[in-house]
Amino acid sequence: MRVAVTGTPGTGKTSATEAFERGVADAFVGDGVDEVDDSEVIHLNDHVGTDRLYTGVDESRESLVADLDGIEAWLDERENAEDRKEAETLLVESHLAHLLPADRVVVLRCHPEELTRRLSERGVEKSKASENAESEALDTVLSEAVSRHGTESVYEVDTIDRTPTEVGEAIAAVVAGERAPSAGTVSYLEYFE
């Protein structure tokens, strides 16, 4: 099974999936849930540059333009590699993960004001942080995920007032099938008022 963990930059994808990797999944082992215990996490953004999974450079954003077809082929090849550990579940973490084939899609959400604060702490330019906050308020990633995968495969997780471990536990519940799909449960439209 392939699970996409996605969201606007700053929502906590990397922190939550790192918590998942550190052992959040172990809490589910006693329940006999092999999919959670036997998972592999791919931090996709780490591979876009190193594995040349891009088509060019966007000079205005100072970022690589991801090659989604190339990434899809790379993931398929990686899943089918003979020397790869046999994992029941492949978690793909990236702000682009929802644009790729997946059985389940976890969309992490964060209030735009908190998102702006997090991105500012990272040193992201104010204009870029504002752009991401507006994207979050408009449900951009959620809308794209639902459009591509349908509401029955999308699980929205609000990261406000949750630690990375708690968000990792929510991801583990999705992987284990212990959480119902929940697209459209979070709204930040008041951000524009």
Write out the residue ranges for each language-model feature.
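Walker A/P-loop
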Residues: 14
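ATP-binding Walker
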Residues: 11
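ATP-dependent small-molecule kinase phosphotransfer cores
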Residues: 37-90, 96, 182
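Hydrophobic anchor at the beta1->P-loop junction of P-loop NTPases
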Residues: 5
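Post-Walker A helix-loop "phosphate-sensing" segment adjacent to the P-loop in P-loop NTPases
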Residues: 22-42
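NTP-dependent small-molecule kinase module
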Residues: 147-193
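Conserved phosphate-donor/acceptor-positioning beta-strand/loop module used by diverse small-molecule
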Residues: 102-125, 132
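P-loop (Walker A) phosphate-binding loop of NTP-binding proteins
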Residues: 8
